[in-house]
Swiss-Prot record:
Reaction(s) catalysed by this chain's protein: trimethylamine + 2 Fe(III)-[cytochrome c] + H2O = trimethylamine N-oxide + 2 Fe(II)-[cytochrome c] + 3 H(+)
UniProt KW Oxidoreductase keyword: yes
Stated name of the protein: Trimethylamine-N-oxide reductase
Post-translational modification: Predicted to be exported by the Tat system. The position of the signal peptide cleavage has not been experimentally proven.
Organism, scientific name: Vibrio vulnificus (strain YJ016)
Keyword annotations from UniProtKB, A to Z: Metal-binding, Molybdenum, Oxidoreductase, Periplasm, Signal
GO cellular component: outer membrane-bounded periplasmic space
Enzyme Commission number, as recorded: 1.7.2.3
CDD domains recorded: MopB_CT_DMSOR-BSOR-TMAOR (cd02793)
Amino acid sequence: MAITRRSFLKGVATTSAASVIGPSLLASASANAVETTGTWKVSGSHWGAFRAHIYAGKVQEIKPIELDQNPTEMLNGIKGIIYSPSRVRYPMVRLDWLKKHKYSADTRGNNRFVRVTWDEALDLFYRELERVQKEYGPWALHAGQTGWNQTGSFNNCTAHMQRAVGMHGNYITKVGDYSTGAGQTILPYVLGSTEVYAQGTSWSEILENADNIILWANDPVKNLQVGWNCETHESYAYLAQLKEKVAKGEINVISVDPVKNKTQRYLENDHLYVNPMTDVPFMLAIAHVLYTENLYDKKFIETYCLGFEEFINYVQGKTKDKVEKTPEWAAPICGVKADKIREFARMLVKGRTQILMGWCIQRQEHGEQPYWAAAVVAAMIGQIGLPGGGISYGHHYSSIGVPSTGFAGPGGFPRNLDAGMKPKWDNNDFNGYSRTIPVARWIDCLLEPGKEINYNGGKVKLPDFKMMVISGCNPWHHHQDRNRMKQAFQKLQTVVTIDFAWTATCRFSDIVLPACTQWERNDIDVYGSYSSRGLIAMHRLVDPLFQSKPDFQIMKELTERFGRSEEYSRGMSEMDWIRSLYNDCKKSNEGKFEMPEFDEFWEKSVLDFGQGQPWVRHADFRQDPEINPLGTPSGFIEITSRKIGRYGYEHCQEHPMWFEKSERSHGGPGSDKHPFWLQSCHPDKRLHSQMCESEEFRATYAVKGREPVYINPLDAKAKGIKEGDLVRVFNDRGQLLAGAVLTDSYPRGVIRIEEGAWYGPLSEKVGAICTYGDPNTLTQDIGSSELAQATSANTCIVDFEKFTGKVPPVTSFGGPIEVA
């Protein structure tokens, strides 16, 4: 059966075909049939490739390109980003910082700024770089914050900033990321690679061979709307086929999740509820059943794995805790009845079973453990390396699972200095501090400078940095515990932010420089992050608005101030670079993919290389583990890691274990005071915080102008809350306002506020309520363990009540308070 967009959409009961394309696009499509004025240009985004109708110098309409058969409704929000009232329009400097020249931090966050010229702003930026390198050294400058940026091979804003700043002097940077910090650290010890960003078994192989698919804390229907590069959305065709197979009883799909997520509602598959943050006890009990009932694949364990005996001794209660991890032990913790645990374990070994893990589950305290334990369960099943079997950690991300064509995409603008180059301040003395820090521990540097922490087998001494340069990312979205951040930012002398949107990060900065959006400059990008379906020309749709500039131009002008502009740009313009990147790409793909000359490509705008060949992850390892070893120390799957064991960590030991959380709902620590688990997962209508500023699109989901909080109707009734009421959500770390949405997709004791909601404090003071609904006002800022030191955002419990006070205005949007 041919898979169409309609066949996919009709399964989502809460989403109509019109809403996915977007009413404004459907409404304007008929008018466009007779539109003869203006031009259409192709461009791209994290939300997919599109054609934009340009008339009178403005973007009038956006339509997905023909290759995208399952476009996301978020394309409707792109116009709202370009023309948002929250655009950074002019270079701005914080009033008190400029006025007092003493790096006054007590009023940081009051959003009062002075407009200055570009020359004044860049002079101040350069002055601060000089001062910090001269007075302190490279340890005092942090320029390592990164995020999703915008798409495009050339215009990577972080690369532009770090090359320019790096030409001036060295600086503190980071390792890891917020999305998969725990997972990408633990899995190389267990499976030999980070796995989370690796291409997975092709969907076609899974659909053809799997009898059971376990979606463990995984919501691909929601998350596949966006991609790291310009996304194709080809995965949705496979999900449509999966829906048909579920309906016919050909594949058994079970969602293991505290909530009934969008994918479960679309597929209409079975749902197995597990108490939040208790998947590990459930997994340990599964391992107990598989072992005691002799259901595990002993031959696979003996041939491909190391350390099973130590792990199974722990499961049997033969180690120091003396607790046997039976289903009866796990049931009161995880909320799954003992008989159901046994039934689930037995099902896993009946036929071919594919486990598909999500990322949210590892963003918690001890987040390394569920990924490690899941790998052990998959090893006991014994199907790793078989079509439709084994385990994946990425089938909800970008186009993982869509066969790759093998096309080698274009390179990018160089982040590092060219060979032989040295910075103006060629100083490598970091004063005993670590040059690289775990990405989620930077606030600790400000509050506990000089502290030595464990990290991944080594030691990190937290640097006492004084200045930050932030480009194209929003740490006041992706980091945790806003009030702790407020306290930490009092320690900073200077914060420079380069962005196109006035985020909370801009609010808490000292110098803000207006970058343009990706649709106000030219670029190229791979079409399909993992499928490498083709290549997209990203045409500039309109000229940069207000006084915004491309990052390339901003950094050229900065490097002019210390005589390095020509070296920075290599004497090339934007289009010189794009042409060069294309030609290098053409050369590297010679004999494999036919690519026209650049001018023809630029006019054509889209190169389509078709679909790739199916592939099975770990098949080569299974075929011959000696010739094709994993990247672990032994080359085998390490159920027990002696290397980790030698680290001597308390909270991440030599094999997967259950560690109680510092706080947990459903009878866990702290639940008597704050009984509800707050799930702050990836949003359905944004890419993290990108698109929250798009006013018309935000209005399609906001509740009374606030971020939605999803509540079980019985929990809401107990607190006198009705649909649409304003709700105050709170704990000891902070408080926020959100709009109530009542739904039985969320069990009692669980609420959801999606991450990426823009922080809008009522004031700069610690403890001020967030007026819009940023969940990171409430989350705790602790490392997952000594191993990964990753974010633990989902270890968060709260309480809530109907808000009955005077309703404050939302302060998140609209830019700064400009002071003459």
